[in-house]
Amino acid sequence: MNWRFVELLYFLFVWGRISVQPSHQEPAATDQHVSKEFDWLISDRGPFHHSRSYLSFVERHRQGFTTRYKIYREFARWKVRNTAIERRDLVRHPVPLMPEFQRSIRLLGRRPTTQQFIDTVIKKYGTHLLISATLGGEEALTMYMDKSRLDRKSGNATQSVEALHQLASSYFVDRDGTMRRLHEIQISTGAIKVTETRTGPLGCNSYDNLDSVSSVLLQSTESKLHLQGLQIIFPQYLQEKFVQSALSYIMCNGEGEYVCQNSQCRCQCAEEFPQCNCPITDIQIMEYTLASMAKSWAEAYKDLENSDEFKSFMKRLPSNHFLTIGSIHQHWGNDWDLQNRYKLLQSAMEAQRQKIQRTARKLFGLSVRCRHNPNHQLPRERTIQQWLARVQSLLYCNENGFWGTFLESQRSCVCHGSTTLCQRPIPCIIGGNNSCAMCSLANISLCGSCNKGYKLYRGRCEPQNVDSERSEQFISFETDLDFQDLELKYLLQKMDSRLYVHTTFISNEIRLDTFFDPRWRKRLSLTLKSNKNRMDFIHMVIGMSMRICQMRNSSLDPMFFVYINPFSGSHSEGWNMPFGEFGYPRWEKIRLQNSQCYNWTLLLGNRWKTFFETVHIYLRSRTRLPTLLRNETGQGPVDLSDPSKRQFYIKISDVQVFGYSLRFNADLLRSAVQQVNQSYTQGGQFYSSSSVMLLLLDIRDRINRLAPPVAPGKPQLDLFSCMLKHRLKLTNSEIIRVNHALDLYNTEILKQSDQMTAKLC
């Protein structure tokens, strides 16, 4: 063979690819496309990122194959040297360049641009030339292994890997048999990927593919390639520009110029490539990785909830009484198995948090010169207080396949998914004073027995001196219409006449069963006028109903604001119904069949029933319209013939309050209040009217218990004072004296704490 020809053939070889493959990577590596030892390769720039070896490595690693095993042998090895470049005197003995290459250099001129260098020289001939290398052929078998899958299939990943190594070692002895068995393992387990590589002349008598340089160059630790920059064969005035152009091509992918300033290097992007500094692909991969980490963060909490330690802890919690956050915390701290499991979770969360922070820092570092602003929020760690609240929610808000969040301040659940079926029966509270001594076996929500000094009355504990039967002589709190919530809902759907409360409709702005324009605020009231007509009754509201009809293709959706006056009085002495807040119900809208009318129903039930004398309903529309389309007056007959306006009109054909009346003995109650007032003015002679004090305390407690819900931490409304003012006609000073006397008796004689209330009337 003509060795001179071989030297001339390869002395201008340009090595345009750099292939790096790890022989082994720890199986504990993450799912990112590169591990920590390859962080310097994260930027998507230059030919390396698109080389075949790197792409194969990335693809296999994404599929979970974290270990590579390669067995190979080489044939027909020749050492070659570029003797032309080894000459030191290139002026007297110039390098014999190819005519096409010389023509390309002449086309550059004396001041070529970066793009000219890239298009004319670098893309055709590369950036380096070969100094010395080894020629020959290679036959290799490469296996990519996923040790986690091998472990699941065989039970011992180490033994499986050793067995695969022994099988692969017989490749050169029995190639066909080895490949057949490896392919069977690959198909049955999916834990390995097998690749064969055969390049170069595989025998001393075969030189058919010597013209393909890449097929006969050997790349191994023994057969190293020696390269040198192509600038050494350029004229001196082109050498610096070539280096800049080569760096721009490799680091900026030919989309800008590589510039270094103040120890920082970046790509100065061309106009047609404004995002050349931004590795979009890597950023997207990192964002996907962070999303996966956040998902695994949430799954770690679910794993703890599904663990045997947590389930056994939930089973050991007592279910015969209500558990506060404090009592759950005591049980939590006493469960050593759960504590050990919780510590493992905390350590895993800390490692995961650091991993997320490192990835996020890399993400933001890569996005410094991007127009793309990454949006990432570090997942919040669940505190011990949140875990205790979670346990409480699992205890009391996990029923009928629904779940929700428990609010201890209100002893109720906020169900998720717009349903109210998640709440289980809330057990009674066991404690001292008027708390239960034991919950009822028939109904765990009620008391079964009371502490010393208290007696059981209708499922609750009251002081023994209180005669609840006697308070019925003043106000008949217990009636035949105290149905369960399911019964009430059924009766409301049937419009049962027993629940009708006959009220008077009052409105200066709308008329029933008449179309009107709701785009301005409309007001209507339903009142009982009990002070004039029904002085011997007070009234309870348990629901409301309205029938609203709309024009066809109407875009309006009415919105209601409802104020309740419990015992008459002005509008300022009413309270607003907090629909959908603090567990309060919402309006239910049902369309009537073959009609443009809807039934709007509000079911308060036994939980939210309350006193009422007057109901004020303010009606608004959710649709905002131009001023020209508005009815400025909002009164008078409407023009239904105008097609531009009639689609906004609605009418209320029926409005009804559901509830019942309680018998109220105003004279008897007034005499009891006067006794308390006199005892207070005489210097606190409580003992002379002890039974009256206990009686009024019981009445006040039962009335204020029907107050509307308030935000956590805020006092309830004082409905008892409203009753004294409007039904008994007491003055403000008399009301203050009565309440003060009752508070003193409750704290000094009964040694009980007073519940703070807010003034309403």
Curated annotation (Swiss-Prot):
Superkingdom, natural source? Eukaryota
Instruction: Give the signal peptide as a residue range, or say none if absent.
Output: 1-16
Quote the Pfam families the UniProt record gives: BRINP (PF19052), EGF_BRNP1-3 (PF25415), MACPF (PF01823)
Choose one Gene Ontology CC annotation of this protein and give it: neuronal cell body
Q: What biological process terms from GO does the record include? A: cellular response to retinoic acid; central nervous system neuron differentiation; negative regulation of mitotic cell cycle; positive regulation of neuron differentiation
Residues forming the MACPF domain are 68-251
Under the heading InterPro entries, the entry gives: BRINP, MACPF
Residues carrying a glycan: N156, N433, N443, N553, N599, N631, N677
Keywords from UniProt, A to Z, are: Cell cycle, Cytoplasm, Glycoprotein, Growth arrest, Neurogenesis, Signal
Q: Where in the cell is it found?
A: Cytoplasm
The family database entries (SMART domains) matched by this protein are listed as: MACPF (SM00457)
Which function does this protein serve?
Plays a role in neurogenesis and brain development. May suppress cell cycle progression in postmitotic neurons by inhibiting G1/S transition.
Q: Which family does the record assign?
A: Belongs to the BRINP family.
Which PANTHER family does the record cross-reference, listed alphabetically? BMP_RETINOIC ACID-INDUCIBLE NEURAL-SPECIFIC PROTEIN 1, MACPF DOMAIN-CONTAINING PROTEIN
UniProt-recorded name of the protein:
BMP/retinoic acid-inducible neural-specific protein 1
- The organism encoding this protein is Bos taurus (Bovine)
Gene name on record?
BRINP1
